[in-house]
């Protein structure tokens, strides 16, 4: 896999999906970011077995493929890229990220091992006014757990 992507787009996409990136899990591959370069797009996906978030980003794809990047490390490196354009190249087990004079290489997982949640194509929308949603959250926030053990 080899593609070029705007560093700003990459950081925006990673920020969105990182919300589903688990900090601890019994399955190390779930601590990664699934990436698939196809056509003129890059699909990024994270899940913690209860929540899955995906985003599709525009990219210049030279070689299609998929791999699972190490989540937190990839997130930190992407945020520190110095140039406007980032090039990411992979082989079966490594990822190389280049931007300007910066270059980083890291180990990766095989995409076939990644556990994706089934995606339902049913469309269901609810429109709620912003103030109504804020009020609903304020009235229920007291009941949320402070940590994951409860």
What are the residue ranges of the model-derived segments?
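Structural preference for solvent-exposed beta-strand-turn elements
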Residues: 1-150
């Amino acid at each position: 896999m080899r593609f070029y992507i705007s560093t700003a787009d990459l950081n925006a996409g990673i920020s969105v999906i990182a919300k589903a990136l688990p900090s601890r899990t019994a399955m190390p591959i779930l601590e990664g970011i699934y990436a698939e370069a196809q056509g003129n797009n890059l699909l990024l996906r994270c899940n913690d077995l209860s929540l899955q978030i995906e985003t599709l980003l525009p990219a210049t794809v030279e070689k299609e493929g998929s791999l699972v990047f190490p989540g937190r490390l990839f997130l930190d490196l992407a945020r520190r890229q110095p140039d406007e354009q980032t090039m990411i190249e992979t082989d079966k087990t490594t990822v190389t990220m280049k931007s300007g004079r910066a270059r980083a290489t890291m180990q990766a997982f095989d995409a076939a091992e990644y556990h994706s949640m089934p995606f339902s194509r049913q469309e269901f929308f609810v429109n709620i006014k912003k103030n109504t949603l804020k009020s609903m959250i304020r009235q229920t926030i007291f009941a949320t757990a402070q940590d994951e053990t409860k």
